[in-house]
Amino acid sequence: MFLTDEEKRILDGAEGAGKQKAMEMLYALGVTFDAEKLIPIKRAHVALSGQEGDTYWCELLVEGGATCAVPPTTNPYWDTDYLTKFYDVTKEELDLANRTGEAYRKIGAILTYHCAPGVCSNVPFLGEHIAFSESSATPYVNGALGARSNRESSISALAAAVVGKTPYYGYHIDENRHGDILIEVDAELNECYDWGILGHCIGEMAGSLDPVLVFKNKVRPSQEDFLYFGAEAATSGAVAMYHMVGITPEAPTLEAAFGGKKIPAPAALITNKTLKDQETKLTAATGDINLVMLGCPHYTYSQILEIERLFAGRKVSHNTAFWILAESGAVELAERSRLRQKLELLGVRMVGNTCIDEPCWKSFEGSLGVTDSPKCAYYRERRGQPFAIRRLSECVEAAIKGRLD
């Protein structure tokens, strides 16, 4: 891989051990993927997890004197000040959370603690070269916005932020952004949940291929729809780029989506029955519940408003906790507009700066939870909590009853 004289100096340690380690990471990544060079990036997003590996890497760079040339936004870990009022954590878990925040402050990150940066906190333009980690963020910025990012890890995204560059391979190159597989959709998509189930189907069908979707009916996905679609396609598969013909910016036509290549025969037709079968496969669990968890990816203000409408003044069962995880700006807006206070009177709590995959939720493990997000269920089940997946209205009804029928 070609390096400029300046890049060679960084690799040789002339600008400090921390920046050297970041460059070593980028160089190794570039060589692995046959990148011809490094290119400058305009933005970065780091999927910090508040877990040991990510925190160690950031601390290692900081100890070597590194700071970010391109300050990245960050994923959430958990709101230690707020959630410790409700749930017990160990000293080690709290110390790790505090270490994480301190390390990313020192390296110069923008501490947004938000898993959907392309929606509001770090929105790239069409064609911008960026380095975004977080599985739901990458398909959103590539597919819905037409920015250019590979499926970065938190490690490589932070290295790119420190150096201000990323290897030139993969989705940074025009010909690698074209579709690989054609899927037709003839189904009703009425809310975010439907788009999430569609995404889950697409991920299973496409794997790591780049799907091109043709809709038989006219659809207008919202930013939340795009976000949930990509999040689930990256959960059941490894989708980091997609096209929706006539909808997403790089697919004005079917021919453009495939980059002039021969258009393949449709690999599948997704119908209402396809979505229903997928939903049935994901949503079998019933019984008493102890938790409704929403916000994976983080909820927006409009989604919080919809929850208030669905409750219609009714209250959460005393046996059930109801948590909305949202971008901190949405939480602040809800408080300013008195929406948060109204929901709290019904037993609904919301928190910003927090992920579903954190130790603060461990008291719920072993009992049934409910969510509208297959991605949430995937991560929580890895921590020992079975989850049922339902559309939002059903989540609300289950919370009121304290059980899922």
What are these regions (language model features)?
Residues 1-405:
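Non-transmembrane, aqueous-exposed alpha-helical and coiled segments at domain scale
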